A protein has these predicted regions:
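Long, helix-rich interaction regions
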Residues: 5-13, 31-46, 50-230
Length: 230
């Protein structure tokens, strides 16, 4: 496999890196780090994402993730399938960054500079109640309100279908699926910010939560099988 990584074409390198990730071959982790600086973005994506899953030292992944996310965001706009793939891979890297930072101090300045919908995705996967004020602030922006509500739900366990936390439904023209915001917000009611904020007041202590409970392997496994992802 090392020969394919060293001498293969882009598709072969990506295939080998994905194979290493899926099989959990931790012995290949040192070889993966060589490709963090690859000139090919798809190879870097596969190497960094594989290393995130394999490495027990998540702190080593924060800088490579930040650099790669930054490079994705500086790409020129892409259309069609390439544009969708770029967006999906960027979002996946942000999710991985949130998970790798979950027991560490996160790079606040970097996250604050991301597009706001990516900030929300990060906070959802960072899974810490200390970010609730930031999510509530983002929820005040109408175009972000629904996906920020989903992020709050993933941390606190609040039911996004509970009418107690939703504004009365009104007839409105559904937006065309022209942006990632529309994709994530589809089917989500408009939250009542005041009631959601009031509910969040109970989370005064900084703690890691997933759906209102401490983050443990068993709790995550219980929910990941049929849960949705932001």
């Amino acid at each position: 496999m090392i020969k394919k990584l060293d001498n293969g074409n882009i598709q072969e390198k990506v295939a080998v890196l994905d194979y290493i990730r899926k099989l959990g071959l931790q012995s290949y982790l040192p070889a993966l780090t060589v490709y963090f600086g690859s000139n090919e973005l798809s190879v870097r994506f596969s190497a960094v994402s594989a290393a995130c899953w394999l490495s027990s030292d998540k702190s080593m992944m924060i800088n490579p993730l930040c650099l790669l996310i930054d490079d994705y965001l500086t790409l020129p706009p892409l259309r069609g399938i390439e544009g969708i793939r770029k967006n999906q891979q960027t979002e996946m890297l942000v999710r991985l960054l949130g998970q790798c930072c979950s027991e560490l101090t996160y790079p606040f300045a970097f996250i604050s500079g991301l597009p706001e919908y990516l900030q929300i995705i990060f906070y959802a996967h960072y899974a810490n109640t200390k970010t609730l004020p930031l999510l509530l602030s983002l929820m005040e922006k109408e175009e972000l309100s629904r996906i920020a509500f989903v992020a709050v739900s993933l941390i606190t366990g609040i039911d996004i279908d509970d009418k107690e936390y939703l504004l009365p439904a009104k007839d409105e023209k559904l937006p065309e699926i022209t942006s990632r915001l529309n994709v994530f917000g589809t089917g989500i009611g408009m939250p009542d910010i005041h009631k959601v904020t009031s509910m969040c007041q109970q989370y005064r202590n900084e703690e890691r939560l997933f759906l209102g409970k401490s983050v443990t392997a068993s709790w995550c496994n219980t929910n990941f099988s049929d849960g949705s992802q932001l």
